[in-house]
Amino acid sequence: MEVTSSTLAGQRFLHGLRTDQLDALAATASEVMFPAGHRIFAEGASVGSFWLIESGYVALDVQVPGERPVIIGTVGIGGLLGWSWLLLPYQYAFGAVCVTEVRAIEFRAPAVRDRCAADPDLGHELTSRMFEVLADRLEGTRGRLVARSLA
């Protein structure tokens, strides 16, 4: 299915962007499906894409030397996967593996960065929204650490 500005307007992360901004993002996007168990990306890999999750769940993990990956969180419906597209050195900070079958909108990161450079308002909006996601995840991690220390 083709990704359109109407498709993107319904995404929580992109709600409120102008139609021309949504059109610019739609030109960089496609719909993808991943089966349960599929590793979307590995920690430290070069960033090529980021995703908005339409259905399913993705586990975020970190590699611990000599151990299995440790799951540090999940991203579900409406969530953003792959915030590292915005920050140098453009490497994924965590790994991501599908817990269930996942349907998502995939954005080509270099093309989105080009559009942000051409439209600073779009760049500001996406950066602000990205930092909201990061702040929410940091708060969630903090809560889990506090709960563990009290257990």
Regions found by a protein language model. Give the residues of each.
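Cytosolic regulatory regions built on CNB/CRP/Popeye-like sensor folds
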Residues: 1-151
